Amino acid sequence: MQLPTVVRRAAAWKRFHYNRGRQLSGLNVHDIEEESMKQFSMRFLLTLTIVACAWQLAHADATRRLVLVAGKPSHPPRMHEFNAGVQLLAKCLKSVPQVKTEFVLNGWPADEKIFDDADAVVFYMDGGPNHELVKENGRRLKLAESWATRGVGIGCMHYGVEVVADEAGAELKRWIGGHYEHMFSCNPIWEPTFAEFPKNPITRGVKPFQIKDEWYFNIRFVGDLPGNKAAAEGDLKFQPILVAAPSDAVRNGPYVYPPGPYAHIQAAKGRPEAMMWGVERADGGRGFGFTGGHFHDNWANDEFRKVVLNALVWLAKAEVPENGVQSKLTQAELDANLDPKPAK
């Protein structure tokens, strides 16, 4: 039985194109497929190379520069160990590859180029009228203002939180959200318990802890905020980090200097106080204040150390690890780089 003519012609047409496809320009289909695979492999490898280079460039650009400025030696041994402290913190931050940490010892750097392209600058030093920021008739304050204007993070730790209100109070409130003010704030040595933390990158992985230090409180915050609750004040987003309520005995003194007590400190009994806080500024920069750090040996406390390390990473706009910055210290590392001081 013969197929209809139209069916036979269709079958012949199909066989012609099938055979044509198997032998184009003298190549069989296997040759074509092999050549196509070679081209695909080359293109794929080229694409992978481009992607890898782009990732490396992006990763390099993501590295943040943090500068820690330590003050000159002061106080008895193992107190106000600013030089040893910044070197210890820099060592611990080596576990965070996105942050390149540099430090300055013994006060203001002789070469200010270290501040060029810094993403964050932190001052751990004596403050008040001798604060390194207020010297040179305001020139350094203007320099720091230029950093803030371009979004550089600024942090102050322990005595570095204190400035004379008329000299630099407005600047510190603008940059970090507040400052220690003589005769308004107080500086007792006491042992608060930090039991609860806000949800914030600075508190990642931090567990409740209790530690004795010269914890300043009743800070002069921007807009006269009490400082114990998150708030928006002007161009700042304010977030307390370490908060605890001093006992009446702590409020009654003595404080380190002047010994007090101050009536307004006693009148605020029962009120929780912020001893560490962070701010986000409208210029895109961040700031933080930390009033602990008097006793050098406190850096051996994992939680105390972690909350500060987290804050340094956050200040530089790097990503704080999910469980916080991990670090370990040996006694030898804690004892390293201490200032030569006469025993008292």
What are these regions (language model features)?
Residues P97-A110:
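A short, well-structured beta->alpha microelement
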Residues P73-Q87:
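Glycine- and acidic-residue-enriched helix-capping/strand-helix junction motifs
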Residues Y18-S36:
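Short, Lys/Arg-enriched N-terminal segments with co-localized hydrophobic residues
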Residues D61-R64, A70, G85-K91, S95, ...:
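Extracellular ligand-binding/catalytic regions of CAZymes and related secreted enzymes
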Residues F44-A54:
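Bacterial N-terminal signal peptides
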Residues C156-V256, G324-K344:
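An acidic, glycine-rich "communication" segment
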